[in-house]
A protein has these predicted regions:
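Short, hydrophobic-biased segments on the C-terminal half of alpha helices
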Residues: 63-67
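C-terminal regulatory/effector modules of DNA-binding transcriptional regulators
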Residues: 176-266
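Mid-protein regulatory/catalytic core that forms ligand/cofactor-binding pockets
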Residues: 122-206
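Short acidic, hydrophobic short linear motifs in intrinsically disordered regions
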Residues: 39-51
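Short, Lys/Arg-rich nucleic-acid/phosphate-binding segment
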Residues: 79-85
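Short, amphipathic alpha-helical interaction segments positioned at domain boundaries
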Residues: 93-115
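Short alpha-helical segments that sit at the start of domains
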Residues: 2-31
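Glycine-centered, phosphate/nucleic-acid-interacting loop/turn motifs that mediate DNA/RNA or nucleotide
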Residues: 73
Length: 266
């Protein structure tokens, strides 16, 4: 099947293209995180071009983004004969692995062991700010954090209290899930709902394009809010419906073999 003559593919790419300004380097991070995160996984320059250019991104922009990612320590590049190959550095693999559970988790978190940390205004703020860098904490206000898991034992300058039940007020829900995030999630949900089942003969590169677009859009939603159970979600939050649509489509687009990405379709 000619990659340039597939109406379903072209329409779906247009549907999934991020309505916000796309950062090409971020698209490439999503691509490697999905298709080539494992140690030793490599993608050729021609395969990258074949996957990314259908999104309306020019080869020159891909080269600039790769240069930035090399400079930032995410990606290494090498020559294989006349071809270029690209792969994640150890730093890049670690960064990708750190967010993989969030991106590919099929349900929201369901922790049951909550605690509150309260810092003295001023002197304890630095310690609280450090705690809030951990993924299992959210800020309630300037001096209070809510966390799940065991209560830390090395925070002598803060008050700690276990919480047996939680009632989440609307103002905190709105702070954790602000309106622009809710709107971005709703837009993704609406786009996914309009996509019909994939045809049976997509090329490996076309599959890579679609998976990258889906993961990139979902990543931009799911990594912008804490991983919290439904009691924290606003009434208009569509994240869980969106999550089901994301994985319903990804399941119909199995990961392509990396070697197959170098073979153009007939």
């Amino acid at each position: 099947m000619n990659e340039q003559q597939n109406p379903w593919f072209d329409a779906t790419v247009q549907q999934l293209n991020d309505p916000q300004n796309q950062r090409v380097w971020s698209v490439i991070v999503s691509l490697f995180g999905d298709l080539a995160q494992e140690k030793g996984a490599r993608i050729s320059g021609s395969a990258l071009t074949r996957i990314i250019t259908p999104m309306g991104i020019k080869p020159e922009a891909i080269r600039v983004a790769l240069h930035r990612l090399r400079k930032d320590g995410w990606i290494e590049s090498a020559r294989a004969g006349r071809a270029s190959i690209h792969y994640l550095t150890e730093y890049g693999r670690n960064q990708s692995a750190a967010v993989t559970p969030r991106i590919y988790g099929r349900s929201a978190a369901a922790p049951g062991d909550w605690h509150v940390l309260i810092a003295e205004d001023g002197t304890g703020q630095t310690t609280l700010d450090e705690v809030l860098l951990l993924p299992n904490y959210v800020a309630v206000n300037r001096t209070t954090a809510l966390g799940h898991g065991p209560v830390p034992h090395n925070l002598d300058d803060m008050m700690a209290a276990k919480v047996s039940s939680i009632a989440v007020p609307g103002w905190l829900k709105a702070r954790l899930f602000p309106l622009p995030l809710c709107e971005a999630c709703k837009e993704l949900q609406q786009d996914l709902k309009q996509i019909t089942p994939p045809p049976s003969r997509l090329s490996p590169a076309q599959t890579g394009t679609l998976r990258t677009l889906i993961v990139h859009r979902w990543r931009r939603v799911v990594l912008r809010h804490p991983d919290l159970p439904p009691c924290f979600h606003p009434a208009d939050w569509t994240g869980e419906t969106c999550r089901a649509l994301v994985f319903g489509l990804l399941d119909q687009l199995p990961l392509p073999e990396l070697a197959a990405l170098d073979t153009p379709s007939d």
